[in-house]
């Protein structure tokens, strides 16, 4: 009985989020992603001032707005964002989806910022997407490059990630069962 109720609640949450997303045109969705990215970067620069120089000298970056829910044993998240090539300023619109297991109840609104040290890492992210699994403790990796990526977690060679919650930069990054991929609808011009 409890599983049936939980399943119905999760389906309802998913359907409501799809209805809310479906109202915007592709142009409106692109503009929302741009505004979200600008605001998120401004917030990050206030919380981690060294991040601005790191992003400025990077090959590129990606910014995502994510909403996660955890209901008893099931956790899910979905989001959208934009990746930018720092040299060419080319924008690529992307999506994120995540699923996992873990005990808890709640909703988490958070932002994820990827910083790509080199073109190879950026191109791999853009062309192959990215799948994350596991957890990383940001405090354990904060000292590389004389603090250039202070507050970030290295998730792959040349790829650093900041996670911002309403309380600031998260000290622990969770990317379990997470997939980032291109949004084909928004990348059509």
Labelled PLM ranges:
Residues 23-189:
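Small-residue-enriched, tightly packed secondary-structure blocks
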